[in-house]
């Protein structure tokens, strides 16, 4: 057990370090995860025997749940809405057309058996959301014509259709399904997936908005459980769990819930971990010695997908929807194959009997080619097609983006002889660019106007324009340790011998805004505004 945990910890740490290096050199990190798995595998250096496809399928299915959920949860609907119709058609009709064209190519050109051809096409018909998200984020790749949102939503929502096609073809190959049953399967997949997705999302939204979690972070644990529930419930009765999970993700991600930004970051990290797991397992399951045999076939399918099938489908769908040629070209190139294709390939290997071709290793090579070639060249192709928008912020398409405001909020307590006490706001002489935004009076929050009277004990929040200095304001901290000569002295005494302004005092958990008569106490931390770096300990007291 300890050895297994050590190995798992080592793999995760190595993957995290590889991720940092990958971002610097521009090589997709998923290739490194696969390579690491191959090094650990039967043909690798460590030669760990692992051929349990059933176990791998179960683990990868769980991992894909969170990848699907994050595909919805991280998407900002306000940005995606203008291209939602295009994305949905691409993720349904586009997936089916891609599967069909690829299947026909495998059957007529590569001479695969018919249903095995269609199975291959179905398995690799969806694009990878996590890879697209990663490239857009890491490269801060702003794209014209709302293309980033189109790619994010398409890649985030097309796995359910690919899964459904794979399940149908596997049932046909097993001789377990009739024409009527196929129609019902399609109906059940979509209907139950949609119904459960919306119902679970609405229920979870109500809980998150009205239930107070007693422990910080339990809201993220609750959402994690909801993601699993969204997959399990429809799947138990023949529905599409991945579709349900995606719908729950996109509804919750675009609802007004507390701590949403931190939850997006949590699921971003979790999705990264799940990607590590899937691609490491792919490398672990693979036999590098088997790759040369299937590589020509995989290369032929990859080139057909990249240069023929994907462009035909993309232009066929987006041209009637009035998309520009350059946008269609970039969308065509950005159809990366990834985690879902791997999971469905493992599923096909486990379920299908008497396959004539090694679908698992073929998909392995296709994913490698897609990520290494297409993924690496997306930023370059965006420039070639004239689709880079340097004035747009791609991070706005994600739900953890917070608009930057050139304003700062300041809290003031009105007490004692404060000049604002018992005066109305309109009676005060204040700068035009200072705005009263909130008054806290006991347990009451008041949105003020000119007639509002400020009372003793009020906490007043005002806003003012933010200062954008470039290094001309510097701060340093001066700790008043035991025996310090300034203990018991006043701020006015300190000011007489120092050109530095004490802007605040950290006193335990309290922040004190100092005045001249304010006493300096032991363990205080004085925060000083210093015109230039000085040795504060050299300040002498007369």
Where do the language-model regions lie?
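Transmembrane helical cores of multi-pass secondary ion antiporters/exchangers
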Residues: 1-391, 404
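Cytosolic regulatory regions of ion transport systems
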Residues: 312, 319-330, 340-542
